Amino acid sequence: MAASVSSVVVLDRGNNTTCTINLHGATIVSWRVNNQEQLFVSKLAVFDGQKSIRGGIPIVFPHFGQWAYGPQHGFARTSRWSVEKQPEPLDNGDIEALFSLVDNPITKQMWNYSFKLVLRVILREKELQVSFNLYNTSVEPFQFNMLFHTYLKVPDVRKCNISGLQGCMYVDKTKENGIYQEPREMVTVNHWTDRIYQNTQQEHVISNVVSGRKMKMIKYNMPDTVIWNPWDVTSNTMSDFGEDEYPNMICVEAGIVITPITLNPNNTYEGTIVLQVM
Ligand SMILES: O=P(O)(O)OC[C@H]1O[C@@H](O)[C@H](O)[C@@H](O)[C@@H]1O
């Protein structure tokens, strides 16, 4: 079914603090804190209910990267999700909503398993918590990748520092998947960057996001972190990304990438990121 303008769910915590989820991919397309947008969405992003949305927080599942059986980064970001629970205030005033994706004939053509994937979004005063629960409802085990492909909005990517990567091994996709070790305490991005860092620290702090503030990302059960910026080198290969936009975004993507998880029947796996405006 094609997504339409009405295919969005808005969490509103008051004080112009909102989070908007597009049911196409359950993609978080906006997170505003006191009216200030924290996420980057390309001006050329396509909202046709077909293509994945270029920006915000798309969900990569069940496969990361190019995939022999389906589209790059899997089908979750191009599937129509259901609202499991409409936004409701919790006792402390935070707002929670739940979304779900269940196997169907289209997903089974690519990945012949039964599953239920639930996304829980909690909007706090200065925090956004995004969790997934994956249930294996098949009769056999399956393996999966999962990643929150978070596009942060930044005034100038060259001024951002990212902590939590020092000493980690990484796959450099810009260098024929060569494997290197990160020596830097603070990683900067000054050129085309596409790296899968393995077993990163639980927290990343990204400096110089909107208004020169810092953003903390805390992750649970999501061991790896992808850092991506297409720069002018690969911007022009994407029809839904402006050639002048790369300075204004940085993708810091927490996920299960290098070693897929094996999930047994009737078992569940939960992972979370918390984004915190500092
Ligand atoms: O264009 P897509 O499919 O949204 O992917 C964007 C990028 O996503 C990143 O996670 C990958 O590491 C990159 O290789 C990829 O280019």
Regions found by a protein language model. Name each.
Residues 1-57, 202-223, 267-278:
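Beta-strand-rich N-terminal accessory domains
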Residues 21, 132-138, 277:
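Asparagine-centered strand-capping/turn motif at beta-strand->loop junctions
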Residues 30-32, 140-146:
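Short, hydrophobic/aromatic beta-strand segments
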Residues 71-125:
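Extended, loop-rich substrate-binding clefts of extracytoplasmic carbohydrate-active enzymes
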Residues 141-143, 151-226:
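Active-site/ligand-binding surface loops and adjacent short beta/alpha elements
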